[in-house]
Design a protein with these regions (language model features):
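Membrane-anchoring hydrophobic segments
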Residues: 1-100
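Membrane-interfacial, low-structure loops and terminal tails that flank and connect transmembrane helices
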Residues: 1-6, 77-87, 164-187
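Loop-to-transmembrane boundary segments
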Residues: 5-9, 83-94, 137-149, 183-188
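Membrane-interfacial interhelical loops
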Residues: 22-53, 91-148, 169-170, 206-235
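Alpha-helical transmembrane segments
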Residues: 64-75, 152-167, 201
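A conserved hydrophobic secondary-structure block that centers on an alpha-helix together
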Residues: 130-132, 140-171, 175, 183-188
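Internal/C-terminal transmembrane anchor helices
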Residues: 180-208
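Membrane/wall-proximal cationic-aromatic binding patches
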Residues: 231-253
């Protein structure tokens, strides 16, 4: 149990690194350094809210593998660790590459519309797939961006493989609840770790320990639009756009 939760936290760190890397690219491409230097007082709040938005993504991604980890731990079978490892490799490979792709699309959308992904994003799909492919082929640096995406995807797959091949965690003594030599002290320690882990996931999914959960108003950290645009990530903005599209569809019908 302990080592499987540790693997999940390591994979979560990879997601945070991906989102942080995209933020750096966004800042370099769209935010003047003078603007950042002139608003240093808002940086602590900006970074804190950036972490909240990114941790929400991390914790939602954690939900499925966490549930499977607890279910498999209850089975107490020798093959569960092997199955979980294979699942994590496939799951996080798909999720991380999707996050990278959505973040890249969001950067391209911002460069054209000076906004993160919004309701307008879905208009591209109304023209049909061939028109969309033609527009991308003619208006974007497909070769450079495709090569960059391929290289980053290969790097992500390599990191995932390295995480799952880390055997130092497998030697953790008597970590499993199924171990016959689990002492009372170790059981208390493991129970505490599990409770803290669950609290971390729940709070992260909510994005807040205060009265209101994380919401779009938390992106407003200054009176500068570009600094505010640094706060949300592509996944949150896509979710917001999907909600707006659903509301618009209800109004039309």
């Amino acid at each position: 149990m302990y080592k499987n939760l540790t693997y999940l936290l390591k994979h979560s760190a990879v997601i945070l690194v991906i989102l942080f890397f995209v933020r750096i690219c966004f800042a370099i491409a769209f935010v003047p350094m003078g603007l950042i230097g002139g608003n240093l007082t808002v940086l602590p709040r900006l970074l804190f809210n950036v972490l909240r938005f990114d941790m929400q993504v991390v914790c939602y991604v954690l939900l499925l593998p966490t549930v499977l980890t607890f279910v498999f731990a209850a089975l107490r079978k020798p093959w569960t660790d092997r199955v979980l490892s294979r699942f994590r490799k496939v799951y996080y490979a798909i999720v991380n590459i999707l996050i990278l792709a959505l973040s890249g699309i969001d950067l391209g959308f911002f460069s054209n519309f000076n906004s993160h992904i919004n309701l307008t994003f879905f208009d591209f799909f109304n023209e049909g797939p061939m028109s969309l492919i033609q527009a991308i082929w003619e208006e974007y640096h497909c070769v450079y961006e495709g090569l960059a995406f391929l290289l980053l995807s290969l790097l992500i797959l390599y990191v995932i493989r390295r995480i799952e091949s880390d055997r130092s965690l497998s030697c953790h003594p008597n970590c499993s609840l199924g171990g016959q030599k689990t002492s009372r002290c170790q059981l208390i320690k493991l129970s505490t770790i599990i409770l803290l882990y669950i609290a971390f996931v729940v709070i992260g999914m909510r994005g807040s320990v205060w009265r209101f959960p994380l919401q779009i108003e938390d992106t407003f950290v200054s009176n500068q639009k570009l600094l505010n645009d640094l706060v949300p990530n592509a996944i949150y903005m896509l979710k917001k756009a999907c909600k707006e599209k659903a509301k618009a569809f209800k109004v039309e019908s």
